[in-house]
Amino acid sequence: MAVLENIEIRDILPHRYPMLLVDRILEMEEDRIVGMKNVTANEPFFTGHFPEYPVMPGVLIVEAMAQVGGVLVLKTVPDRKSKLVLFASIEEAKFRRPVLPGDTLILECKTLKRKETVVKMQGTATVNGQVVAEGIVMCKLVDRPAPSEPQG
């Protein structure tokens, strides 16, 4: 059973289709979180990456890790509706094997260091227990800008 379902994730993260890359949060502790992304053949990125051999772009695997980490960071912020978690950097990124349509991507982030508004996490992505990608993700907590007025 999931700790957070997709509707609850959408209440925490500002991302929406097609850029929301987390379907569920499976486990969550103070300094560790595990999320899941079902990678389907209908993902929009498979249209061009690559039509003959669809592979999930590595940058989107990293983004999915960062989103899972963002849930962990925002869950600890009292006034999270007024904050955003921005992806700041990735270090030591390694991609071990392709992620294909039909794969279930398990994304784990562990907090390594936290200073006021900056969080450093170890991210690991697995499929069927095999590491497909890993890296050190850095995120920054910032104030959410006020909604802009419609132009017209």
Role assignments for model-derived ranges:
Residues 25, 56-79:
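Active-site helix/loop of acyl-thioester processing domains in fatty-acid/polyketide metabolism
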Residues 2-26, 33, 138, 148:
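Flexible, low-complexity linker/boundary loops enriched in proline and small hydrophobic residues
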Residues 17-56:
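Catalytic strand-loop segment that frames the active site of acyl-thioester-processing enzymes
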Residues 23-26, 91, 96, 108-112, ...:
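Conserved positions in beta-strands of structured domains
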Residues 10, 52, 95-97:
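Beta-strand-rich interaction surfaces with strong enrichment in secreted/lumenal proteins
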Residues 1-3, 69-106, 132-134, 139-140:
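Hydrophobic beta-strand-centered segment that forms part of the acyl-chain substrate-binding groove
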Residues 14, 100-103, 110-152:
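HotDog/MaoC-like acyl-thioester-processing domains
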